[in-house]
């Protein structure tokens, strides 16, 4: 019997969509040679809801809540991009107080996102304490969301021309009181993880991306900064009042999972710096005033005015039945969301509904590089790499 032994085949396994480390509904088809990953095939679309098409059938105000449901970890950052796009087409300037509140809540969203990511990344590699501490802080931030908008997650708080309602002084005081104790929690997380031998063994030199590769794959946000480029839209293309804020952009030099973790930790500290500056400016005399534009064709008139003026009542009725008419044109507006560059390409035909609203989600570009990042690593490293990409499926599948 000299039958030839059958050729060795690689082993194919499914990772997800029910896997606890798969962050939502990700399905990866992995080709393994023993423990070594030969190929990664991400299957997306399990959370596809047709958001871009739905937005075309809604007025600009009705389209706003769809943006909360993209990256549902930090909802207000997406609303920000959509508002900026519409405001640039309308050619309006948001009142200073409205801009300050927006920036304050965008940074709260950054804290929400980074807390979730850093602590679950630690959980993916076996550390169980950080998520418990991180979620305690996220709960406090969710309460700030709730007190501003009435909702913990899907806030629907930003408006074209500003924000929906002013913040009560007590809420501003409470956010101020949150800042310093929070920095202590970040330091505690730092002590738990940064020098931890096991955490470093699982993250150092894993998922390395050079700067050239990061640009070629269309990365943005932490993925680019981890590879050594100080690219942050808040600095390079400032929007709202970011030009006045003093903060540093942390960058890594190795482009591995560990550097990306360190950057997120430092970004949380910088976000608190920005929040403190916003609070200081909100309390200053030039920080008082309206939170939304006073043009009644764009923002609804005040209640008291509607009781006195017939015009105001008509404006209110037209705004909520027909909506804002945005001048014809096309524009791309991007914000530095916690996960990277979140962009909205808005095409208007002059009607009260967007003609087309293309959403550029940062997580989409990062997920497409899973194959390139994981090749040659071990199976156990896949979840570490996935954790450091910071992927949320709401925005990938849209």
Curated annotation (Swiss-Prot):
Keyword Calcium annotated: no
Primary residence: membrane
EC number assigned by the record: 7.1.1.-
SUPFAM superfamilies xrefs: HydB/Nqo4-like
InterPro entries named in the record: NADH_Q_OxRdtase_suD, NADH_UbQ_OxRdtase_49kDa_CS, NDH1_su_D/H, NiFe-Hase_large
Compartment(s) of residence: Cell inner membrane
Membrane topology classification: Peripheral membrane protein
Family: Belongs to the complex I 49 kDa subunit family.
Role this protein plays: NDH-1 shuttles electrons from NADH, via FMN and iron-sulfur (Fe-S) centers, to quinones in the respiratory chain. The immediate electron acceptor for the enzyme in this species is believed to be ubiquinone. Couples the redox reaction to proton translocation (for every two electrons transferred, four hydrogen ions are translocated across the cytoplasmic membrane), and thus conserves the redox energy in a proton gradient.
Entry protein name: NADH-quinone oxidoreductase subunit D
The organism of origin for this protein: Bradyrhizobium sp. (strain BTAi1 / ATCC BAA-1182)
Recorded name of the encoding gene: nuoD
């Amino acid at each position: 019997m000299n039958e030839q032994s059958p050729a060795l085949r690689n082993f194919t396994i499914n990772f997800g969509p029910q896997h606890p480390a798969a962050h939502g509904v990700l399905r990866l088809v992995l080709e393994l040679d023993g423990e070594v990953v030969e190929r990664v095939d991400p299957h997306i679309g399990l959370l596809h809801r047709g958001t871009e098409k739905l937005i075309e059938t809604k007025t600009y105000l009705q389209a706003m809540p769809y943006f909360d449901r993209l990256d549902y970890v930090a909802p207000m950052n997406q609303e920000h991009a959509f508002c900026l796009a519409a405001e640039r087409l309308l050619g309006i300037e948001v009142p200073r107080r409205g801009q300050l509140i927006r920036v304050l809540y965008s940074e709260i969203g950054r804290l929400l996102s980074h807390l979730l990511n850093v602590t679950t990344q630690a959980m993916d590699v076996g550390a169980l304490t950080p998520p418990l501490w991180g979620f305690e802080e996220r709960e406090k931030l969710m309460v700030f969301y709730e007190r501003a908008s009435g909702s913990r997650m899907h806030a629907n708080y930003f408006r074209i021309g500003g924000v929906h309602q002013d913040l009560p002084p007590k809420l501003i005081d409470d956010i101020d009181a949150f800042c310093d104790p929070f920095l202590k929690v970040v330091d505690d997380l730092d002590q738990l993880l940064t020098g931890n031998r096991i955490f470093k063994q699982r993250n150092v030199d894993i998922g390395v991306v050079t700067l050239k590769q990061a640009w070629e794959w269309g990365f943005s946000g932490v993925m680019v900064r981890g590879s050594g480029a100080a690219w942050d839209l808040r600095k390079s293309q400032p929007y709202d009042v970011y030009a006045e804020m003093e903060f540093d952009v942390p960058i890594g030099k190795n482009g591995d999972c560990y550097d990306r973790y360190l950057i997120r930790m430092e970004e949380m500290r910088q976000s608190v710096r920005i929040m403190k500056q916003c609070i200081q400016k909100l309390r200053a005399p030039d920080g008082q005033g309206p939170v939304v534009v006073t043009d009644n064709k764009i923002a609804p008139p005040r209640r008291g005015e509607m009781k006195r003026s017939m015009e105001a009542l008509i404006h209110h009725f037209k705004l909520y039945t027909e909506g804002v008419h945005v001048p014809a044109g096309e524009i791309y507006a991007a914000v530095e969301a916690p996960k990277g560059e979140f962009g909205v390409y808005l095409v208007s035909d002059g009607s009260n509904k967007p003609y087309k609203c293309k959403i550029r989600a940062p997580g989409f570009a990062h997920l497409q590089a899973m194959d390139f990042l994981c090749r040659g690593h071990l199976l156990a490293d896949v979840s570490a790499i996935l954790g450091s990409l910071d992927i949320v499926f709401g925005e990938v599948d849209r």
